[in-house]
């Protein structure tokens, strides 16, 4: 690993990104699996091992030997059968190559990130990794804005577009050829996938490689924001021409170069907004602006044109929803967020004259979307589509304590994740569904009715692990009010949540 980092830190590497030799090193594939090659065993399919117990070290050596045979790595457009490792499991080889490529290509980007943080003297903060850290930002900023665009980043992406995207970062032709080969082999071996050449093809079997491809694609989608925010008002025509070239407007460059700089200033002025904020999580992003409705519509039109021309795909305008914050809430990270106007009347009196002052205070609110969450619980077999609790099917060998722990963990996680809700009624209903579903599951296991089961064990049987959240709140807010009343009012954002809740992710 130190040898690899030493080579990557060389100035020549930073200019050329020559990654191809590392794909022929065994330790790269060991890093891909997170252990040494003599550790956990990685087996090929039985038909390729001749029923012998071969370790992953031998498998990697065989793969590297096949990769050295350049005549079998030639990509042919006319005959797809030539794009194969002849006589071997193509799917398995392509998967291993993609895993190794993900390890190699991540290192230069991580080094670039570390150097960028050091240059800007940005201190690392683990609290900023929390998903909940986004909502205090919303509370501070969105109450002063007018419009929000709910954006879904376009997908699926053709495999060739992904290779071209990486080509703009990595000037290493052999590595890109090998990556292209493994991508198409991976796709050809998945005949059950209906969305051909889709980036979602690798989401289950090779998550590390999928995350790298998806992040590179999202970075390209966000390139327009980075460009426009960095440019001043007096933009040169040369800079704007290079931007257009990147978005593949080749036919328009010759005409636009001769346009006066004032026209570019007017064009950029349409998108210049000092009160614009952008937030993204996975494939969904929020673009909020204080400007007029016309400005946000121009952003929508520009984004659609940019994605269509840059990625050669049809980007539906319906994937970008423009909403007014005062009238329409937007869904993000499992919350329905909105800005509500709280009006209040103040009576003032000066000498013998009295008058009233009507004031409106903007308040950012987040609530739990009860209907989508019930639908997610119904998919997980906790209730039906109407929200009526049902018994959850479990293995017969599970003990009562194990079933209780599972239900309790799910309930606590949901309470923990949705602790920032302004109104807790929806969350209490979800707790009720889980509590009654747990009781139905246990009574079904003991072949009894719910009433007889709870009567035998007492109503306090399900109270202990469902009230741990309120007990935790009593430690955070040690006041005289009761924990249940306090939890109904307080909105809490935890800084230890690094991923979205599983049930919320189904929405």
From Swiss-Prot:
One cellular component (GO) term of this entry: chloroplast
GO terms (BP aspect): mRNA processing; RNA splicing; tRNA processing
Keywords assigned: Chloroplast, mRNA processing, Plastid, RNA-binding, tRNA processing
GO terms for MF: RNA binding
Pfam families attached to this UniProt entry: Intron_maturas2 (PF01348), MatK_N (PF01824)
Transmembrane segments: none
Keyword Transmembrane helix attached: no
UniProt-annotated location(s): Plastid, Chloroplast
Annotated InterPro entries: Domain_X, Maturase_MatK, Maturase_MatK_N
Main subcellular localisation: plastid
Family statement: Belongs to the intron maturase 2 family. MatK subfamily.
Function: Usually encoded in the trnK tRNA gene intron. Probably assists in splicing its own and other chloroplast group II introns.
PANTHER family reported for this sequence: MATURASE K
Official protein name in the record: Maturase K
Organism, scientific name: Persea americana (Avocado)
Lineage: Eukaryota, Viridiplantae, Streptophyta, Embryophyta, Tracheophyta
């Amino acid at each position: 690993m130190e040898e690899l980092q030493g080579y990557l830190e060389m100035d020549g590497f930073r200019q050329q990104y020559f990654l191809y030799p590392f794909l022929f090193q065994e330790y790269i594939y060991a890093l891909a699996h997170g252990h040494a090659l003599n550790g956990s065993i990685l087996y090929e399919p039985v038909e390729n091992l001749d029923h012998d117990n071969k370790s992953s070290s031998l498998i990697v050596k065989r793969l590297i030997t096949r990769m050295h045979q350049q005549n079998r790595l030639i990509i042919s457009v006319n005959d797809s059968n030539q794009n194969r490792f002849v006589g071997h499991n193509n799917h398995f080889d392509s998967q291993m190559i993609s895993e190794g490529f993900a390890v190699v290509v991540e290192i230069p980007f991580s080094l670039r990130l570390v150097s960028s943080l050091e240059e800007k003297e940005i201190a690392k903060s683990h609290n900023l990794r929390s998903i909940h850290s986004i909502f205090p930002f919303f509370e501070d900023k969105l109450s002063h804005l007018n419009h929000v665009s709910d954006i879904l980043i376009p997908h699926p992406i053709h495999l060739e577009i992904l290779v071209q995207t990486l080509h703009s970062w990595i000037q290493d032709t052999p590595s890109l050829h090998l990556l292209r080969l493994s991508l198409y082999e991976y796709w050809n071996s998945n005949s059950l996938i209906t969305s051909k050449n889709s980036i979602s093809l690798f989401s289950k079997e090779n998550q590390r490689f999928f995350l790298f491809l998806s992040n590179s694609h999202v970075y390209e989608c966000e390139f327009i924001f980075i460009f426009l925010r960095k440019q001043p008002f007096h933009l040169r025509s040369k800079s704007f021409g290079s931007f257009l070239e990147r978005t593949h407007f080749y036919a328009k460059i010759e005409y636009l170069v001769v346009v006066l700089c004032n026209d570019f200033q007017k064009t950029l002025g349409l998108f210049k907004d000092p009160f614009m904020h952008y937030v993204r999580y996975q494939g969904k992003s929020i673009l909020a602006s204080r400007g007029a409705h016309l400005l946000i519509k121009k952003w929508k039109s520009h984004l659609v044109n940019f994605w269509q021309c840059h990625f050669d795909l049809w980007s539906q305008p319906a994937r970008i929803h423009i909403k007014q914050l005062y009238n329409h809430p937007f869904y993000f990270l499992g919350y329905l967020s909105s800005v509500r106007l709280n009006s209040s009347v103040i009576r003032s009196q000066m000498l013998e004259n009295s008058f009233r002052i009507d004031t409106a205070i903007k308040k950012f609110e987040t609530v739990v979307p009860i209907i989508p969450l019930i639908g997610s619980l119904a998919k997980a077999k906790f209730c039906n589509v109407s929200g009526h609790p049902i018994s959850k099917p479990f293995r017969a060998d599970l003990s009562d304590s194990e079933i209780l722990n599972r239900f309790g963990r799910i309930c606590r996680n949901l309470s923990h994740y949705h602790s920032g809700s302004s109104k807790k009624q929806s969350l209490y209903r979800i707790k009720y569904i889980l509590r009654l579903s747990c009781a139905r599951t246990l009574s079904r296991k003991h072949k009894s009715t719910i009433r007889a089961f709870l009567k035998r064990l007492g109503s306090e049987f399900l109270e202990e692990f469902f009230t741990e959240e309120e007990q935790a709140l009593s430690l955070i807010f040690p006041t005289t009010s009761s924990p249940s009343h306090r939890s109904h009012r307080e909105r809490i954002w935890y800084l230890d949540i690094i991923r979205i809740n599983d049930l919320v992710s189904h929405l």
